[in-house]
Regions:
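Expand to "…catalyze enediolate/carbanion chemistry for C-C bond making/breaking, isomerization
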Residues: 1-176
Length: 176
């Protein structure tokens, strides 16, 4: 009816139980159309028999494991939605998620869209630092050095690649 080519629609599995998180590899490999996966919140907490809290400490292990599994599988992890109403707490959780390595987060409350968008969009300061990192590393390599020093941090290939990824992400988001 809508004339989508066969296989064009991606599948985004939701890991909302302990079994879902533990079996993510099998779920993700079930179809080449799985390019990302979403971690659940409330169903997962209930399945774990965890006491829900605003800081989501009870989901920390599952969040980390889910992220690790997704990255190992080459699929994009989508962090669990923040299901409490407080915007400041939502921002704190989103910042923790981004620090862990998530690049996106599910939303269930309309008021949280702008908060999450702001957290996951690279700032001009972050972009300037990434540009400085890339430039310094490339200059060091051109001089035959294996790393560069930027603001007290030795820049080696992993940090350089993360800076390049951040710049690419900003380009994709049209903020670079």
């Amino acid at each position: 009816q809508h004339h989508f080519p066969l296989g064009a629609i991606e599948i985004v599995p939701n890991a909302e139980t302990a079994a879902g998180v533990m079996n993510l590899k099998e779920i993700a490999l079930a179809s080449a159309r799985v390019k990302s996966a979403l971690l659940g919140t409330e169903d997962l907490a209930a399945d774990l028999m965890a006491e829900r809290s605003v800081d989501a400490e009870e989901l920390a292990y599952a969040r980390g494991r889910f992220l690790l599994e997704c990255r190992a599988l080459g699929i994009e992890p989508i962090d669990a939605p923040f299901t409490f109403t407080e915007a400041q707490a939502c921002e704190r959780e989103a910042r923790r998620s981004r620090k862990l390595g998530y690049r996106s987060k599910s939303v269930v409350l309309p008021d949280h869209v702008a908060v999450i968008h702001n957290v996951f969009t690279p700032s001009e300061q972050e972009l300037a630092h990434a540009r400085e990192t890339v430039l310094a590393f490339e200059l060091a390599r051109a001089e035959g050095k294996d790393r560069a020093l930027v603001n007290g941090l030795w820049i080696e290939p992993p940090t350089y690649l993360n800076a390049k990824r951040l710049l690419e992400r900003a380009r994709q988001l049209a903020v670079a």
